[in-house]
């Protein structure tokens, strides 16, 4: 598939500035062909985010965008990353990102290692402290 890809975006479902369909439409106008919505997630909002984004796949296709449903696990205690990532995939996430250890977002020590050793995690974002 040609065009631009963005596999790490946020919407007003967490700390982004656009509602999900607006993000999809703007990405379409800018020439993106694949976009993943990967709002910050933990056990309290994981199912809600996945269900919400998956509802947009058909409207996104009408704008010429292949929408991937994702989550960015943030502040999950490292021992719980594997089961949380597995739950995300089981419940319909196409991509699982983990927010890494960085000076900007002080997630728990050991998060980077837990993410890198988990087969259900696709991307370690903002690894900062390696």
Predicted regions and their residues:
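Active-site gating loops and adjacent loop-to-helix segments of metal-dependent hydrolytic enzymes
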Residues: 2, 31-34, 57-58
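Extended substrate/RNA-proximal surfaces in nucleic-acid metabolism proteins
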Residues: 46-130
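Histidine-centered catalytic micro-motifs
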Residues: 4-14, 40, 127
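Metal-associated gating/positioning segment near the N- to mid-region
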Residues: 12-50
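Residue-level marker for buried hydrophobic side chains located in beta-strands
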Residues: 3-5, 36, 123
């Amino acid at each position: 598939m040609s065009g631009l890809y963005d596999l790490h975006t946020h919407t007003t479902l967490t700390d982004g500035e656009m509602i999900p369909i607006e993000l999809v439409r703007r990405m379409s106008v800018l020439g993106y062909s694949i976009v993943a919505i990967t709002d910050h997630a933990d056990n309290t909002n994981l199912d809600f985010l996945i269900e919400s984004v998956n509802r947009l796949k058909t409207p996104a296709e009408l704008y010429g965008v292949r929408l991937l449903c994702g989550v960015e696990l943030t502040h999950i205690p490292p021992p719980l990353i594997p089961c949380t990532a597995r739950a995300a995939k089981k419940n319909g996430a196409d991509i699982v990102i983990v927010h890494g250890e960085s000076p900007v977002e002080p997630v728990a020590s050991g998060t980077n290692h837990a993410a890198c050793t988990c087969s259900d995690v696709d991307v370690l974002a903002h690894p900062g402290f390696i």
